[in-house]
Amino acid sequence: MAKMYMKSKDMVELVNTQSWMDKGLSSQNEMKEQERRPGSYGMLGTLTEEHDSIEEDEEEEEDGDKPKRRGPKKKKMTKARLERFRARRVKANARERTRMHGLNDALDNLRRVMPCYSKTQKLSKIETLRLARNYIWALSEVLETGQTLEGKGFVEMLCKGLSQPTSNLVAGCLQLGPQSTLLEKHEEKSSICDSTISVHSFNYQSPGLPSPPYGHMETHSLHLKPQPFKSLGDSFGSHPPDCSTPPYEGPLTPPLSISGNFSLKQDGSPDLEKSYNFMPHYTSASLSSGHVHSTPFQTGTPRYDVPVDLSYDSYSHHSIGTQLNTIFSD
C-alpha cells in the first residue's frame, strides 16, 4: 500500500510539471506575437514617411534649379489673402492721412494765433512749436513782471532758440527789426546835426570864370569828405548866426555846357564886382522845414563839408573867351 501511494504522488507531480511547461510555452508564443505586431506597424510608418519625402523631392525638382531656402516655408498667396492684405493697407493709409490732416490743421490754427502770422512765409512745424513755447513763456513773464509787449526783452524772449529767418520775421512783424532801429539812430543823429549846425559863410566874388582848377565843380566835390557831427558843431558854432542871404540880383540863364563843364551866366548887374557873403542852407533829411534856395550843383550824398577857404577870383567878361581857349587847347 505504501508503494502505491508513492507512485500516485509522483504521477501527480509529473502532471503538474507538464501543465506548467505548457503554460510557459504558450506565454512565450504570445510575447513573440506581440513583438511582431508593432514591428509591422513601424514598417508601415516608415513607408509612408519615405513616400512623402519622395513627393517633396519631386516638387522641388519641378520648381527648377532654384536655391533651397532654409526655414519655414511661406504660405501660398491666395486671392482671399491678397484681398485681406490690400484692405489692411488701405485702412492704414487712410488712418495715417487723417492723422496728418488733423495735425496740419492744428498747426495752421496755432500759426494764426502767433504774433508773426504771415501768409507768404510759412513757418515749419518745429519752428511753430518753438515759437509757441516762447510766446507762452513771454506772456507769463509779462503777467508776472508787468512789462510791456513792445519792449526789447519781450522780443528777445520770443526769438530765443529760433533760427535766423524766423527771428527776422518776428522782429519785422513787431516793427523792431534792424532797419527800424537804424532809422531811429539816423533820426537821432540828424536832429543833433540840425541843432548844432548854424550859419556858415564864405567869400564869394563875381560869378565870372573862377581860377583853376578850371571852375569844374566835380573836382571840388571829389575832395569833399563827410565830417563827424561833433566837429561840425565846433566848426560852425564860431560864426555869427545873424547873417542873411544876399538879395536876388537877377534871373539866371540856363547853364552853359562846354564839353561837360558847366558855367553859369548871369545878366548884368551893377554889383558884379562887389564881394559879399554867401550862406548855404542845409535842409534836414526829413524835409521838415520849407524849401529854400540851394546851389545848382546838388549831389545825392548828404551834408558834405565845404572848405571855408574856398575863394574865387574875379575876371572880366572879355577875358573869359581867352581863358576857355587856353583851357581846351591844353
From Swiss-Prot:
SMART domains: HLH. GO terms for cellular component: nucleus. PROSITE patterns: BHLH (PS50888). Probably acts as a transcriptional activator. Mediates neuronal differentiation. Required for the regulation of amacrine cell fate specification in the retina. Residues 23-80 are annotated as: Disordered. Efficient DNA binding requires dimerization with another bHLH protein. It comes from Mus musculus (Mouse). This is Neurogenic differentiation factor 4. Expressed in retinal interneurons amacrine cells (at protein level). Expressed in neurons of ventricular zone of the retina at postnatal day 1 (P1). Expressed transiently in amacrine and horizontal cells of the inner nuclear layer (INL) of the retina at P7 until P14. Pfam families: HLH, Neuro_bHLH. Keywords: Activator, Developmental protein, Differentiation, DNA-binding, Neurogenesis, Nucleus, Phosphoprotein, Transcription, Transcription regulation. Residues 67-79 have a biased composition (Basic residues). GO terms for molecular function: DNA binding; protein dimerization activity. The lineage of its organism: Eukaryota, Metazoa, Chordata, Craniata, Vertebrata.
